[in-house]
């Protein structure tokens, strides 16, 4: 938890906003409105980020190119479509702490997860288990179990779960490492979230990778709630792969194209088994339409089809805002915003709610998960009627996230006032 001495009162929130060097970025997004026309208090960037105001213009630009150029837009549009996805490569690499050749923007998260497991989950008689956290996002669990089934194995014996201690909600680092040390020789793949979607816990990805590699395990991460939220250094940490979506903290829009990281020790090995498609074929000979697949070097060699330009355009708009704001500045503000929210909630301590997200800022991002012992989902609905947008996760968790690109300290203050009144 940050040591900044937060004060109560609306004046303090206004003072924090007045000296916030990132405050003006709020004006580059479209906040939902209440029925009376006021901006909502939008604390749901962990579920769907706000629309950048430039997104519509970027989409319209490509629609005009399509109308005016037809197929020639692939080569002669102002932003030619053939290499369009590469406009995002440098920005994406910086965002996740990777080298440009290690990342590609493509598909959706679960599709990319299947592609990665096709290459990296290679079970043997002795090493066949997949380690996941209990409470992982259901799509990950479905994908993992289906891969185990596909290989003719039994999920009951091949799926290994990390669980928190009794009466705790988050995993302890020492328990994760101990399990890997104990079971590692039978684990083929460690697949964990960078940030758990339910609790908001950020995992020690560097430590997990080190422990996994020490035991000979492949290590991968689902960064759906981490990309654009917490600092990442994927190349230096050394996991084998990672996947993420782009519609949460990255503000790419509903169902936006996802991203994929393949560490360079694998990315430049075209002989690595994979599911192939024509867009992953060496671009120098792609249009010769030959019968044999020759993978491109780098993460681009896992591409299947040509990218959807109209879906990439809003992501490009958002990534340019990230570049202008600076990742270090965004993280610094995020730590303060979340610490401020936690501090204000603590001033309204009640047996009716508790924060289950870790208190240490190194172990969380923007999200706070609030466990309710009364009211339940009806509280979330009542707050929505008052212009406060968070979200509910069964059985008892209300999730909120103050996103540094577009949330203010006054947003946080007003939320806590309305929440504390609603929970009484």
PLM-predicted stretches and their roles:
Residues 1-424:
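Pyridoxal 5′-phosphate
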